[in-house]
Amino acid sequence: MDKPIDPFESINRHLAPSKKKSLLKKVLIGIVVILILLSIPYFWIQHLYPTTSPFKAISYLNYYRSRPHQDLNKSTMGFAPYWQLDKMQDIRLDLLTDVIYFSLTVDDQGNIAKKNAKSEDDPGWVAWNQAPTNDLIAKTQIAGGRAGLTIAILDNDKIKNFLLSDSSQTNLITSTVKEVNKKHLKLINLDFEYTGEPPEELAGKFTAFTNKMKQELSSKAPGTELDINLMVRSGRDPGLFEIEKLKSSVDRFIVMSYDYYTSGSDSAGPVAPMNGAASKKYFFDVTTTYSDLLKLLPADKIIMGIPYYGYDWPVEDKSDPRSLALPQSDANGYVETLSYGRAREDQKFSGDNCQFDELAQTPWCGYTEPTTGKDRVAWFENAQSIKAKYNYAKNQNFSGIAIWTLGYDKAYPDLWDILKQTFVK
């Protein structure tokens, strides 16, 4: 049997050992160069989108290439709370300028909380570091939007102790800048909710802290926007917020214009009535909130908070939209949050038992709950009420809107369609 022909045999016979080594070296160098060139896009993508793997990022890039970001005439923000992250699959990132994670809580020493009061893992911190959040951040950035983070202190004593400590403020500012740079964030939202009247010195302390936060962000994370949340009565009862002094360091003010009536209210009522305060039908309303704030702020500094939810109360009389609420108990039932999606899919929130309140620009329904036999009244948001709020924000020439919360509309496209009709150029 003939010996197989070696194609390199003649070359090997004529090459000296030194030349063989030189050729092998060149081949190896060539392979290394090719591998380096091939790896450059990998590491570049990893640099651009550090919260997810390059392979996922490439798949997101391919997906959003055919779904370009819409050209919007206003900012369209959406809050993504950690407890809603499994409901984000249907959000339209092409219609959102900003997605803001809610939230990392802070203790009175300025540390981002990793444990709660029961020494359990803090759910906000846990979710912040898990794949669903990291992937949402990358998707937002790839789709053409900005990813943001809410830093929250919701306890009066913690707010007081924090603001009275320079070292606590430094701790939080340092940690915030670290998170911004680590995840390529472009927006920090401060949510300091002090209830009641704070000690006189705290407002000045909050202003000074906000100034320091803005200075550090500008220095160490250039281009990062700093926003703060305001409450519905902040225009006339400023509490912690020296609004006119804050204008120089705060880019925009997100107004939480909802929860005018809550699960703890004595009676049923609209979560965000557009009107009704002047006639005393409602204790306060959205129009009055912004009328007050526009005396202190230019419209282009204001972001209008938009609720995608309402509440469903056990009440004394289902025929009265402002009926007194029954004490919450197993016998009477409990107040429930009623998201747009749930109201949309449940027939008892769309029948003859429902009416649209023209003053509040919000629907309500009265019905009897079969399991308890008790009357209930639900106030919630539907497409008509959301459209009224979007149009109000546009007509007032506000900087934009902020949805509370993303995912409350489930897979229904209605509100995305209205947002597109209202804010796409």
Language model feature labels by segment:
Residues 1-26:
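N-terminal Lys/Arg-rich, disordered targeting/topogenic segments
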Residues 38-178, 416:
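Glycan-recognition patch characteristic of GH18 chitinases/ENGases
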Residues 48-66, 115, 306-392, 419-423:
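Glycan-binding loop/region signatures in secreted carbohydrate-active enzymes
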Residues 65-70, 134-148, 152-153, 207-226, ...:
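Surface-exposed amphipathic alpha-helices with a cationic face
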Residues 78, 112-128, 174, 195-343:
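Substrate-binding surface in catalytic domains of secreted glycosidases
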Residues 82-86, 104-108, 147, 153-158, ...:
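Solvent-exposed loop/turn segments at secondary-structure junctions
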Residues 99, 190, 253, 304, ...:
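Conserved, mostly hydrophobic/aromatic
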Residues 111, 118, 406-425:
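Aromatic-rich peripheral "rim/lid" segments of glycoside hydrolase catalytic domains that contact
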